[in-house]
């Protein structure tokens, strides 16, 4: 009870927190709800070739409210990543990278969430997810025995679903532990705020004002997920229709399109001529997030309002550039697209490098 009280009730926060500081609470609740809904689905899922697709279909048709739980779990991960991207952008804009351990643990949560979402995407054994796993399996072949350990063989086969199901169960538990560490270091070092000014007279308890604000926001988000599950009003969150077809190893889709939150990395793989180059570029984009932490050594005063012009001109164009990169991931590969995609990837690297460089000159 003392731990609950110190971190959720009596925890002191700045008075000037705005809507951007609700994203972390939303992500925590969505993660717990994903674990609960995933646990419910695991009671009926059979990780075997042929049976995986049939068991998923049986949940949709034969289990009371099974369709809602399955669709909630499917769309919940889209909302989870949507708010995670907003949370990362908030951290970049308001210099949260100057809280190093919070940023490091956040990057670990992001990477583990991507891995969890990918293996979960493969589990229904649909046509699109099967060939998506085949593409990733081809990228990891040079890891040798590690690839066999993860996929159960050199290619995607019956053992792959069993391995992926185990990974999909274990990784959320690890993420939850990292989230607890993330909260610990955040509350130990203190929350950031829009002005980045620590004034002991301008703080108050997390409960009730901020807590009720977070609860109100998460209720709205859960209602949106419910409406999305019933009506599918956000088309980009919908899965590809080919994933509603049982996987066929002898029939390759005309174009492989992963879930929208994986498009950034898939586009990075597409625009490079070799698998190794694409994989290194994808790892490099994640490494840039880590390098943002090291920019804290370049200046002692953290300021979000008195920012240098270079910081604004680097962070604002980064958003449409990332949208362009994601759009390229949905397109069919051709020579012109590769040229455009290469320019977009270089632009992402350039803008983040400018963020690093501008940290030296921000006031």
Swiss-Prot record:
Q: Where in the cell is it found?
A: Mitochondrion inner membrane
**What molecular functions are annotated in GO for this chain?**
metal ion binding; ubiquinol-cytochrome-c reductase activity
Q: Which GO terms describe its cellular component?
A: mitochondrial inner membrane
What is the cofactor note? Binds 2 heme b groups non-covalently.
Answer yes or no on keyword Heme: yes
Q: Where does this protein hold a ubiquinone?
A: 187
Positions with a binding annotation for heme b b566:
87, 182
* Pfam families in UniProt: Cytochrom_B_C, Cytochrome_B
* Primary localization: mitochondrion
Q: Which cofactor does it need?
A: heme b
Q: Which InterPro entries match?
A: Cyt_b/b6_C, Cyt_b/b6_C_sf, Cyt_b/b6_N, Cytb/b6-like_sf, Di-haem_cyt_TM
Residues annotated as binding heme b b562: 73, 168
Q: How does it sit in the membrane?
A: Multi-pass membrane protein
User: Would you indicate the residue range of the signal peptide?
Assistant: none
Regions that span the bilayer: 23-43, 67-89, 102-122, 164-184, 210-230, 271-291, 310-330, 332-352
A biological-process GO annotation? mitochondrial electron transport, ubiquinol to cytochrome c
Keywords (A to Z) from UniProt: Electron transport, Heme, Iron, Membrane, Metal-binding, Mitochondrion, Mitochondrion inner membrane, Respiratory chain, Transmembrane, Transmembrane helix, Transport, Ubiquinone
Its biological purpose: Component of the ubiquinol-cytochrome c reductase complex (complex III or cytochrome b-c1 complex) that is part of the mitochondrial respiratory chain. The b-c1 complex mediates electron transfer from ubiquinol to cytochrome c. Contributes to the generation of a proton gradient across the mitochondrial membrane that is then used for ATP synthesis.
The UniProt entry's sequence similarity note says:
Belongs to the cytochrome b family.
Miscellaneous comment as given in the Swiss-Prot or TrEMBL entry = Heme 1 (or BL or b562) is low-potential and absorbs at about 562 nm, and heme 2 (or BH or b566) is high-potential and absorbs at about 566 nm.
Subunit structure, as described in the record: The main subunits of complex b-c1 are: cytochrome b, cytochrome c1 and the Rieske protein.
Report what the protein is called: Cytochrome b
Originating organism:
Theileria annulata
Q: Which gene encodes it?
A: MT-CYB
